Amino acid sequence: IDRQPMREAKERGELPVFGGPWFGGLEKDIVWVNSVRVIGDATNNRDLTHAEVQGRRDAFAIYEYLRDNVEGFEESRLQQTAPTIGIRETRRLVGVTTLTGDEVRAAAQPDDSIALGAWPIDVHPVDGHAGSHVMYVPDPFGIPYRALVPATTDGLLAAGRCISVDREALGTVR
């Protein structure tokens, strides 16, 4: 799909801010579209509610654009949206150590690695623009156990996007 007409439609105010869009699918005649970008503070219930509503509005607007303007989508229908909006980042643990983007790019292998990561560093702007900073990781990097251990609390381990990482490293480990 040629994305340039979509970018031009966004510039004319006919489409909301979007990323990509990226398309994929595993079944004949069914595609998924990853495109919606909504900003806000996901620790604030009002912002989160707004993001849920706005995200669905934007998904419908993008679907209608595809249906009306892209060959092959003329008889399509929107089957579903995600059950909840995806949250890229909120709070992160202050751990015994912090995995950094520099360590990711250097393919560091800490002595206490508990997993390997190799996903590209994908950081979205926080101001609502559609761009991304994507950097491919040349080699797998280690995720240290100490990044899961809080610096000041005993008997607790973190997992997922809340482990102790800087913003750039979060773009790959999340």
What is each model feature region?
Residues 1-159, 163-166:
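Mobile, glycine/GP-rich and aromatic-enriched active-site lid/loop segments adjacent to catalytic centers
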Residues 167-174:
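A conserved FAD-binding loop/helix module that cradles the flavin
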